[in-house]
Amino acid sequence: MKTASGYASAIKAATSLYADGMQTLTALWEVHTACRINPQGIAASLSMNNLYLETVTEFIRTYRALKNVIAKGGEGNMLNGAERTQMLWNLTNNLERLNRKLRLLSVSVTMHSLDDVWNRAITGKINKSNKVLAKESSKRMCRAISNVAKFYRYRQTHKPWGQ
């Protein structure tokens, strides 16, 4: 950080790190809200995709990067500006990936229901007419629209983190 560009790069990394941290808190709040609006979506989305495993993996990766940044501090482990900035950028990238996974998880929990699990289980085993398929599709679309409306209505009345 001996040059102006090194100092500016460090400030930019720290600023984006703070913004990503706030986005992570907001994304966690969105997952919580999705679970409140559609509790059956938790169990339904578990079998529909592997987002839970991917999200846990991103949490662990981000925790390790954060632990590495914190462990490298102190007088015994002095880092130069380039190393410090590189660690902050790595942490920022990990937080961005974590935020993306959390947002995908909240959408998955909001949209999926046990009807989707049942339909996936019986796919190809029971012949359905076009009329039945159209009714199920319409019902699924109405449910998704209703859940999204509930989600945004809840978000408007309970804004996270002072927004």
Feature locations, PLM:
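N-terminal Sec/ER secretory leader and immediately downstream segment
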Residues: 1-35
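Extended amphipathic alpha-helical interaction segments
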Residues: 21-108
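Long amphipathic all-alpha helical oligomerization modules
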Residues: 70-163
